[in-house]
Amino acid sequence: MTNISLDKLVTESRNENTKNIDRVETLEMLKMINNEDKKVAEAVEKELIHIAKAVDKIGEAFLNGGRLIYVGAGTSGRLGVLDASECPPTYGVSYDLVRGIIAGGESAMFKAREGAEDSKKLCIKDLKNINFGKNDILAGIAASGRTPYVIGGLEYANGIGATTISVTCNPESEMSKIANISIAPVVGPEAITGSTRMKAGTAQKMVLNMLSTGAMVKTGKVYGNLMVDLKATNEKLVERAKRIVMQATGSKREQVEKILKETNFDVKLSIFMIESSLDKIKAKEILDKNKGYIVEAIKEIS
């Protein structure tokens, strides 16, 4: 365990605005919580410069064969797993590109294993099990900024020369001093004292959304604001794929359906084929040459 006293942590402080939350009507109780939640986006906004640095590093790592690995315990670990699990269906990437590791393993997603967070060695073992290397990025998540499991991972990653990021909600935390890039939205005391699944968890989720989304945009997974590498694995996504191609090209549904069928529902390739009027083989050749960036591929043929 670290030596930082809990009573010195912002996330463990008592919130003066909600001291009587147990004595008010339901609507007033919810207003109290909502008023606290309003502070989250502003706290994240103050960290945008640091988030941008992290996004650039992650995007660079992706282009050079690296991965983004989240580590955390409890709520923080679950948020990392959640963000990572959404990347493959949304952006068509492998399940290995963005991974979430939670202290205590997969079972900790559904049942708290709080003691697992106290071991530095456990995180090092978990990272070695996935062959974490110097080309990867490690993002350690902990509201307190003092979780031994995460600190162990950050120290290990630093030791092998990997880029490290900390996502905390306490200023000047131990994690922020260890990581190469510190992201620390200070959301203040929770509505329920110490319940960091609330404001702190919301802030962390917003930051993780930015990290993964920003990196995917930087690596050509988005055209305009359309997710052009999604995998059409169910009926909803099949329809979304059609809409995306229609929106990107202004084409009629009939033409879009024909092209998507020809490309086996490769949304990006379908868009470029329509925009370039090239056949599938030539369009794919130019897209691959431009590393999947539609904008760059269009520039080449203009």
From Swiss-Prot:
Gene3D superfamilies, per the entry:
1.10.8.1080, Glucose-6-phosphate isomerase like protein, domain 1
The answer to whether keyword Protein transport applies is no
The record's section on CDD domains has: SIS_Etherase (cd05007)
Name the Gene Ontology molecular function terms of this record.
carbohydrate derivative binding; carbon-oxygen lyase activity; ether hydrolase activity
Which biological process terms from the Gene Ontology are attached to this UniProt entry?
Answer: amino sugar catabolic process; N-acetylmuramic acid catabolic process; peptidoglycan turnover
Domain of life the protein comes from: Bacteria
The biological pathway it contributes to is: Amino-sugar metabolism; N-acetylmuramate degradation
Which residues are catalytic?
Answer: E86 (proton donor), E117
Q: Which InterPro entries match?
A: Etherase_MurQ, Glucokinase_regulatory_CS, MURQ/GCKR, SIS_dom, SIS_dom_sf
Instruction: Name the NCBIfam families for this protein.
Output: N-acetylmuramic acid 6-phosphate etherase, PRK05441.1, PRK12570.1
Q: How does it assemble?
A: Homodimer.
Described by its record, this protein's role is as follows: Specifically catalyzes the cleavage of the D-lactyl ether substituent of MurNAc 6-phosphate, producing GlcNAc 6-phosphate and D-lactate.
Output this protein's name.
N-acetylmuramic acid 6-phosphate etherase
**What gene does this protein come from?**
murQ
